[in-house]
Each structure stands twice: as C-alpha cells, then as structure tokens.
From Swiss-Prot:
Listed EC numbers: 2.8.1.13
SS bond list: 100-196
Binding site for ATP: 9-16, 35, 124
Protein name as it appears in the record: tRNA-specific 2-thiouridylase MnmA
Family to which the UniProt record says this protein belongs: Belongs to the MnmA/TRMU family.
Coiled coil: none
Keywords of the record: ATP-binding, Cytoplasm, Disulfide bond, Nucleotide-binding, RNA-binding, Transferase, tRNA processing, tRNA-binding
Subcellular location: Cytoplasm
Length: 391
C-alpha cells in the first residue's frame, strides 16, 4: 500500500523543517517544496534566497526527503506586490502576508503540489484545521502566543480540505527542542521577521523606491500646521516614530501620533496623546470579505475580532450590512460592520478585521473605515474625521 503524499512548503526556517520531519515520522511520503517569491535581481542586497535554499537542502538530506524549488516570483508580483503598492498609493496600510497566503502559499503552491500527485499540503503555520459536520474549520493554534490564524483567515473550504498544520498543537518552545534533538542544521536559526521583499532595511527607504514622495502639510485637528510630511503613503495610523515632532508644539509634552489622512488635500493629521479621541474607534466597516465557511455570520452575532496581529480578541457585534456615514467603498460591494464593546485604538484602513467565535476563525475583510471616538465622525483611508476648521 502506497503512502499518502504530502508536499510541505519549506522556507529554510525551523518551523517548516520540523513540520517536514514530523510528517515523515508519521509515515507520510513527504516532498519538500521551496518557494521563491522574489527575484534576487530585483533587490539582491536585501532578499537573497541562497542561504534559505541551502538550509532547505541540508534539512531534506538529514531527514531523508526529496525537495525541489519552484519560482512564483511572477505570480507574487502580479497578485500580491501590485496590490501592495496600489493600497499604499491610496493611503491605506495593507498586510501583504494575508494576500500572500491566499494567493501564493495556498493557491499557486497548492496547485503545484497537486501536480506532484500530492493528497495534502502542509506548512509550518501555527494554526489548526478541524473537520466537523462536513465542513472544515480554521482554529487558533494551541500556543496562542504564536497563533497565525489572523494571516490565514482568507482560506476557503477547498484550500483547508487539502491543508495540514502539524505545529498547531505544539508550543513553539517544543518545536525548538525537537529541532535541537534531531540535529537540524538550522535549529538555532532566528525566526523570520517582516516581509521578504523589504528585508531588514527601514520600510520608508524601501517604499520610496516604488512610490514618489509628495510632501504636504502636517496639521492638528484644529487646522494648525505643525510640520510637513514627505508623502501620505509613508505614514500609518497610530504611528509615533518618524513623524519628526517633539512634544513642544502645544506645550503638553505628550507624544504625537498619526491620526488621519486627507488624500484630496494631501494633508496628514496628527494628535497628541495615546488616547486622543481621533485614535479611538467603536465601529468599523470592512470590505473585500472572505468567510471560511463560505457564508457570513448572522446579523447581530456576538463575536471577537482582531484588527491587527497579536491583538487580543475584542468583543463586538457583527452587522451584515454596512450603514451610515462610515459605509465607504464601491457601490454594491459586500461589506460588513463591527460594533465593539470597548473603543479600539488606531483601527487602520487596509489592515484586516478578522472574526472569531472562540477558537474558530470565521474569516473577515479589509478595513475601509472606522468611526472615531467623537460622535458623527469617521475616518477612512482618504478622509479625515470632521475637522474643527470646517465646522
């Protein structure tokens, strides 16, 4: 009887290496697949994959599996990077890891794995898949400190039905122990941080290679000019560092934060104080929705939600139809709203709002706008809250 073939996405890191070893130990026919998603020619200094490939080959030799490399750089540029630039150009702050998982790691990679006669694919993500009543559920990892379901919320039933997450029930500390015990050559390799194509350089330097600077005024909510920004794309909501303002502009001494952008006037609005009303939101509207089960929760469903990675679930109520002044976005597009029990800090257009029912990840959407802590005010990627100077 032939063994079930599983193709493992191997990055050269500890997590995917231990994933491959665990599946081999469980008796699967394991094939490693290394994905090259960025061409070295595009940026040889920051994104060389040479060492990662060497690590993958070394691990494959140790545990006794075949491995191959596949180039998805063209798909990555078309499906992920182009959207990344479009979002920043529109004043939003996208999360390319979410799109990469949906379009590359669990679409292009999955399709290629099936061409290798695989029954399943596996990755080193910290999450779980459970089949119940004929449907597949995406669950948080047992190790909540490493849970990555937020980045996986756009996966659908077809993708989950072919996916395994062997590390979902193992603490990260145990994964490191396993790597050391079996003598993996990359056992002490640091976890990757950030986005591959950005590398370790300052994010602003990278973005400036693709988006032009367009300086404009930096204003307070009452319209006072306190500085000049280099371009709205280079700032994100809640940003504190890199603004170029001290605490002396108003004499309060409190730090400054980016609070809003107005694309039409090319104005960046900043406020002083972490808990300024312009930084606090009780409601949001999200579009470009995706539900793991293929359908949304019921209107009025009480759930938890994250508006950024590593955030604790925030209690909220789901609304299936976005209404009111905050309902920005293309006419006819399916959107949803969330009303939070407690005000959320720096809810950022372009990031994902991901819903949870306890351990179950329901799906989510891309944040389009958020109502601020002041009645009747909302902020979106291109519009600041109602301004004092305009009242």
């Amino acid at each position: 009887m032939s063994k079930r073939r599983v193709v493992v996405g191997m990055s050269g890191g500890v997590d995917s290496s231990v994933t491959a070893w665990l599946l081999k130990e469980q008796g699967y026919d394991v094939v490693g697949l290394f994905m090259k998603n960025w061409e070295d020619d595009d940026d040889g200094e920051y994104c060389s994959t040479r060492q990662d490939w060497i690590d993958v080959v070394s691990v494959a030799d140790l545990i006794g599996i075949d491995v191959e490399a596949v180039n998805f750089a063209a798909e990555y540029k078309d499906r992920v990077f182009a959207e990344f630039l479009r979002e920043y150009s529109a004043g939003r702050t996208p999360n390319p890891d979410v799109l990469c998982n949906a379009e590359i790691k669990f679409k292009a990679f999955l399709d290629h794995a099936m061409s290798l006669d695989a029954e399943m694919i596996a990755t080193g993500h910290y999450a779980r898949v459970r089949e119940r009543d004929g449907r597949f559920e995406l669950l948080k990892a047992f190790d909540h400190t490493k849970d990555q379901s937020y980045f996986l919320h756009r996966l659908n039933q077809a993708q989950l039905s072919k996916t395994m997450f062997p590390l979902g029930e193992i603490p990260k500390t145990k994964v490191r122990e396993i790597a050391a015990q079996i003598g993996l050559p990359n056992a002490k390799k640091k976890d990757s941080t950030g986005i591959c194509f950005i590398g370790e350089r300052p994010f602003r330097d990278f973005l400036n290679r693709y988006l032009p600077t367009k300086p404009g005024p930096m204003k307070t909510p009452d319209g006072k000019v306190v500085g000049e920004h280099i371009g709205l794309a280079f700032y994100t909501f809640g940003q504190r560092k890199g603004i170029g303002l001290g605490g002396s502009k108003s004499g309060s001494g409190e730090p400054w934060f980016v609070a809003a952008k107005d694309i039409a006037s090319n104005t960046l609005y900043v406020v002083q104080g972490h808990d300024h009303p312009w930084l606090l939101s009780r409601e949001l509207v999200a579009g470009n929705v995706s539900w793991v089960a293929g359908e949304p929760p019921a209107d009025g469903f009480a759930c938890g939600a994250k508006t950024r990675y590593r955030q604790a679930d925030a209690a909220c109520v789901f609304g299936g139809a976005a209404t009111g002044a905050a309902a920005a976005g293309p006419a006819g597009e399916v959107r949803f709203s969330l009303a939070f029990d407690d005000a959320q800090w720096a809810v950022t257009p372009g990031q994902s709002a991901v819903l949870y029912d306890g351990e179950i990840c329901l799906g989510g959407g891309i944040i389009e706008s958020a109502a601020t802590g002041q009645p009747g005010q909302a902020t979106s990627a291109g519009h600041a809250p109602a301004l004092a100077e305009a009242r």
